[in-house]
Regions:
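An N-terminally biased module of ancient metal coordination in phosphate/nucleic-acid-related enzymes
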Residues: 1-87, 106
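A basic- and aromatic-enriched beta-loop-alpha substructure that forms the phosphate/nucleotide-
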Residues: 88-95
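Short helix-loop capping/hinge motifs at secondary-structure junctions, enriched
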Residues: 97-102
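Short, intrinsically disordered, charge-balanced linker/junction segments flanking boundaries
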Residues: 107-113
Length: 113
């Protein structure tokens, strides 16, 4: 259940979820991303208060934040990584290891599989 603070900011969170539906954030960053200053403790507090069922942690070229938080959060954590390639950015989910930097989008897609 979302915290009262989260519901005050986002009233739709108070609505009951229909059977089988989940609240999911598919794209989040921690301080490991380089463009976020959110520490693991701050991230854990925010996600804990959010009422999310699943969060995908998709730091830029890193999975350290997701791995660190995977066992600390009450919700399910999907380990992801946002990769920059010459063809654009790609998000890989359900990763077990980091995808190497500097590879082509084709090789990145193969590594994610």
């Amino acid at each position: 259940m979302p915290s009262p603070e989260a519901v005050a900011r986002h009233p739709h969170l108070a609505a009951p979820q229909p059977d089988g539906r989940l609240r999911v954030d598919l794209h989040t960053h921690t301080m490991w991303s380089g463009d976020s200053t959110t520490t693991p403790d701050e991230f854990a507090a925010a996600i804990g208060a959010s009422g999310l069922d699943v969060v995908c942690i998709t730091d830029h070229n890193a999975i350290d934040g997701a791995v660190e938080l995977r066992d600390r959060l009450a919700c399910r954590v999907i380990v992801g990584e946002e990769l920059r390639t010459a063809a654009g950015e790609i998000i890989g989910l359900f990763l077990t290891e980091r995808v190497p930097m500097g590879i082509s989008h084709v090789d990145a897609a193969k590594a994610i599989r």
